[in-house]
Structure formats: structure tokens, C-alpha cells
Design a protein with these regions (language model features):
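Cell-envelope/extracellular polymer assembly enzymes that use nucleotide-activated donors
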Residues: 42-44, 73
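N-terminal membrane-anchoring/stem segments of glycan-assembly enzymes
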Residues: 1-37, 182-183, 195, 353
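Membrane-embedded multi-pass helical conduit in multi-pass membrane proteins
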Residues: 288-368
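Acidic donor-binding/catalytic loop of UDP-sugar-dependent glycosyltransferases
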Residues: 84, 139-156
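Catalytic donor/gating beta->alpha subdomain of glycosyltransferases that bind UDP-sugars
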Residues: 157, 163-191, 218-221, 226-288, ...
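Short aromatic/hydrophobic "clamp" motif used to bind/position activated sugar donors
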Residues: 121, 136
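Short, acidic, metal-binding catalytic loop of nucleotide-sugar glycosyltransferases
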Residues: 61-71
Length: 379
């Protein structure tokens, strides 16, 4: 293939991404729905926590003060924390007057074959079985819910007959590293998992955002329970997959009022977050890794390279691809309240993500993949 033929590829890719792929780029926050009192449901929230003393209090308080017509019971599983996680969670529940509907569990030792988070969640699900919940809400210890978050999730599930409803929480974009890389993380996630395709029962594609997942207990049981995915490091997408493939209906939306309390002060921290699961996403295939790197080059880097070739037709092709790229990314940039100029940064961002993906593969090869809170979870 000639250089001109190769240079057309990025333009074709971005035309497809703009017009097809479920319009994944059309970012719009899910507006909370008002839940009619007659549709009140019992919700049990399960929060796994390991060394989260800095954020667990705010997470518990946000759930204890929900505007919701049904009962909400909170279960926090302290997964071997060495800090004051348990004390902070208990203090927050007490301050919110939620102790009668709050339970703190000390996590049992991690058995072989389980990831830490899924083992903690499993213990919470076992405890929740005694409460006859209509819905289980899996929430991360660093997720701060908006006041109508639970009502919105339940209303979504009831109105649209969903077995699993997931809201991707709004991630922090305060530091320079976050502003450059975090909106792109959301953009890439939705490009891989377009919400319209996730919600379509005729498609097998499935995904969820682990920070905020509401599901019916019967759907979880039908899918084989958490034991069915016990070793999966990308547990949220694995859970969505077994629920959907067992006949469940799922949906994935973007939340605005519910946000993550986790901050990434440096590029190193964000790189570690990405590389923790990147190679697992590729199913530990070096062939898929090579194809992914080629795809990243053709999609994001080649358009920028073409600007410096000096050949007018090639420059025009590169410019066309960059314009389409920016148009796709712009709604995500706006959602995070950033200048539209950030939409021009995807080629630079792609270089960083390429490095993180390679680093993830190297970590896996060294037997230290999926490092999280002192645990190697992908080796």
C-alpha cells in the first residue's frame, strides 16, 4: 500500500467513529429521575474498602443521606486495612444517624483464586442476603454519591427493566495531569464500550463502571454469583458480561452529581492506574498488544505526523483526521469544564497511553501485574 493509501486510513477511522460506533462520543450526563413513592425498593449498598481512611467517611455519609423513599442499608467490608478505614466509616455512619442501618464487616483472609475486591464484595453479598434486598448497589470507597443517586439508579432500573444499571462517576480533573489524561480515559472507555451498544440486548458487548453498579440479586444469582468472575481484575466489565450473557438487561450511563474522591496528583499515578488493567483488557495476548499499538498509531499519531511530511495532499489528510478527532473528543472535554483547546491534545495523550499499555505488559511478564494496595492481582 502506498503512503497515500495508508494516510487515508486515519480519516476513514474517524469518519466511522463520528458517524458510527453508537455515537459513543455524544457525552451527556444522566439526569436524576424522581422515583415515585409507590415504587420504593429496599437497597443494600456494599462497599469494599482497603486503606481508604481518607475518603470512606465522605462516601458513607453521601449514601446515608440519600433522598430516597425506600430503606437503604449500608455494608462496609474492611478488606485488611492497616489504616483507620473502619474507624472513619463507623464515625461517618454515626454522624449521619445511620448506625441502625449500617454494618461493618472485618474481611476474612483472601483465598486463592480471588481478587481482593471481589472477595470483599462476595462477603458483603452474603451478609446482604439476610436483608431481602430488592437491589444491591456496589459502590467504591472513594465514590461520593449525589443526593438522588440511589433514587436515580432504581428509577432507571424500574423504568427500563434493567437487571444492572451502572453510572460512571465523574472523575477528578483538577490537577494538570488529570486535565490532560482523565477526560481521555472516559473517552477511550466509551469508545471501547458505547453505552448504546451496551444497552442493546441483541449485542453481546457488555461493560459497567465499578464505582457505582446497581443490580437485582436474582440477576446476580442467575449469572453464577461473584464466584463466576472471582479472578477477573476488570471485575466490573466481567460482571456486566456474565449478567448480560445469562439473559440480563444492562445499561451504562455517565453521572455528573456522583463523583470520585480519588485524586491523581502526578502523571506517574495515572500511569499506574492505567497499566494496572491494560494488559488484562487485551486478554494477556502479545499479538493483540501489537495490533493495539498499530491501531493507536494509525488512529491518533499518524495524523499528527502527516502534518510534518511536507506533501500538501498528505498534510490535508492529516489535518482532516485531526479535525474529526477533535470533534469527537470535544463533548468529553466540555463535560469536564475544560477549554476546547484540550480537544487538540489526543495525539499527545495517545503517546502516554501507549506507554502505559506497554508498561502493563512488561509488569505482567515480570509477575507483578495488577498491583493494587500492595497486592499483585494479575500475574
Amino acid at each position: 500500500m502506498s503512503l497515500y493509501g495508508i494516510s487515508v486510513i486515519p480519516v476513514l477511522i474517524w469518519v466511522y467513529l463520528l458517524l458510527g460506533r453508537g455515537r459513543f462520543w455524544h457525552v451527556a450526563a444522566h439526569r436524576p429521575a424522581v422515583l415515585p413513592p409507590a415504587a420504593a425498593r429496599r437497597v443494600v449498598v456494599v462497599i469494599p474498602a482497603r486503606n481508604e481512611a481518607a475518603v470512606i467517611g465522605a462516601a458513607v455519609a453521601s449514601l446515608a443521606r440519600q433522598t430516597f423513599s425506600g430503606p437503604i442499608h449500608l455494608i462496609v467490608i474492611d478488606d485488611g486495612s492497616t489504616d483507620a478505614t473502619a474507624k472513619a466509616a463507623l464515625a461517618a455512619a454515626r454522624a449521619a444517624g445511620a448506625l441502625p442501618r449500617f454494618e461493618l464487616l472485618r474481611g476474612a483472609a483472601l483465598p486463592n483464586g480471588w481478587t481482593g475486591k471481589l472477595w470483599a464484595l462476595s462477603q458483603g453479598v452474603t451478609a446482604a442476603a439476610e436483608l431481602s434486598a430488592d437491589y444491591l448497589l456496589f459502590s467504591d470507597a472513594d465514590t461520593c454519591h449525589g443526593p438522588t443517586s440511589v433514587a436515580s439508579l432504581v428509577a432507571d432500573a424500574e423504568a427500563n427493566d434493567r437487571d444492572l444499571v451502572s453510572h460512571m462517576v465523574k472523575l477528578s480533573a483538577a490537577t494538570p495531569a488529570e486535565r490532560l489524561l482523565i477526560p481521555a480515559f472516559v473517552f477511550f472507555f466509551f469508545k471501547l464500550y458505547p453505552p448504546a451498544c451496551i444497552a442493546d440486548p441483541q449485542r453481546r458487548l457488555a461493560a459497567a463502571a465499578g464505582g457505582c453498579m446497581l443490580m437485582r440479586p436474582k440477576a446476580l444469582a442467575r449469572a453464577g454469583g461473584l464466584q463466576a468472575i472471582r479472578s477477573h481484575i476488570i471485575d466490573d466489565c466481567a460482571l456486566a458480561r456474565v449478567v448480560k450473557h445469562s439473559g440480563g438487561r444492562i445499561s451504562l450511563r455517565l453521572a455528573e452529581e456522583t463523583r470520585s474522591l480519588r485524586r491523581y496528583a502526578s502523571f506517574t499515578e495515572i500511569g499506574a492506574m492505567i497499566s494496572r488493567t491494560a494488559f488484562a483488557q487485551l486478554r494477556h495476548s502479545y499479538l493483540t498488544l501489537a495490533a493495539t499499538l498499530l491501531g493507536l498509531f494509525l488512529t491518533y499519531l499518524l495524523p499528527a505526523v502527516l502534518l510534518f511530511i511536507g506533501d500538501p495532499p498528505l498534510v490535508c489528510l492529516g489535518l482532516a483526521a485531526l479535525v474529526l478527532m477533535s470533534l469527537c473528543y470535544l463533548p468529553t472535554v466540555r463535560f469536564y469544564g475544560l477549554s476546547p483547546l484540550w480537544s487538540l491534545c489526543l495525539p499527545v495523550i495517545a503517546i502516554f497511553y501507549t506507554g502505559a499499555v506497554i508498561h502493563s505488559a512488561v509488569q505482567y511478564a515480570r509477575g507483578s501485574g495488577g498491583m493494587w494496595k500492595g497486592r499483585v492481582q494479575d500475574a
